[in-house]
Amino acid sequence: MSGCTSNYLVCEGREIHYTEWGAGHAEVVVAWHGLARTGRDMDAMAAHLATRWRVICPDTLGRGLSQWSPEPGAEYCLAFYEKLAVSLLDQLGIAQCLWLGTSMGGAIGLKAAAGRLSGRIRRLVLNDIGPQLAEPAVQRIRSYAGSPPAFATMAELEAFFRTVYAPYGWLPDAQWRQLTETSMRRLPDGRVTPHYDPAMVRQFTDHPDDYLQWDAWDALALPVLCLRGEHSDLLLPETAEAMRARGPRAAVVEIAGCGHAPALNTPEQFALVERFFAA
């Protein structure tokens, strides 16, 4: 984890872990990961952006090194994640920021930019997420995220990740290994499993309309860039077209060779995000 620091803060009564890159810079990028992932997914992008920005990469409640919620029905939802984001920024003294969010992390940014962080998020990058999700893709994600498997070896866990996250696009072997090592935990019986609270998928049953955010979208008054995986089953082409036509009228760029969601790990993806944030 060269180039960043590992930190913890209590936000809304819950301990939240985050990594910080480029600590000497005044301008801040918040980079927030996807549903069943961790902030370490942002390492490659954060290392690139840290040459000119301070980058904060949280682990969402119930993921990675952050605390698991004792009230999963109430707290695994966008409204509580938005509260966590506000608390995190307030405690870090961040008055304004640029926001990069993959999947769920983008949905949090969308909600916050139209809500509690209106005026504080200056620019928003949504990585394969919009104000509406395709239901078959949600069911696909729930099928593996809601009942995480356990394996005897790290090699088996890595093979599992390579299968379910194949839509991320190109990752070198070293990055697959890092993805595995930074998103695993060992069970009491010694087996390894993905590093998150399986109860976080209750969001889809306890808050079934959480990801339907057209009202928030139409209220946005900031520049938005949407990266859509060419083969994404979550962000459909018609949704992306509607995002171009209404609300903040997003710029939409299709990322070739990816589904849900681009891994944010290639020079092309670095350049797209950097140019947008620097504009």
Feature map (PLM): residue ranges:
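Active-site loop/oxyanion-hole signature of alpha/beta-hydrolase fold enzymes
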Residues: 44, 57-100, 272
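Conserved alpha/beta-hydrolase catalytic His-Asp/Glu region
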Residues: 152-207
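Conserved serine/cysteine hydrolase catalytic core
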Residues: 185-242, 254
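Catalytic histidine-centered segment of alpha/beta-hydrolase-like enzymes
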Residues: 258-267
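A catalytic-pocket lid/entrance helix-loop region that shapes and gates access to the active site
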Residues: 129-156
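Alpha/beta-hydrolase fold catalytic core
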Residues: 1-30, 51-53, 94-95, 122, ...
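Conserved HGGG/HGGXW glycine-rich cap/lid loop of the alpha/beta-hydrolase fold
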Residues: 17-68
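Conserved hydrolase catalytic core segment
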Residues: 95-135
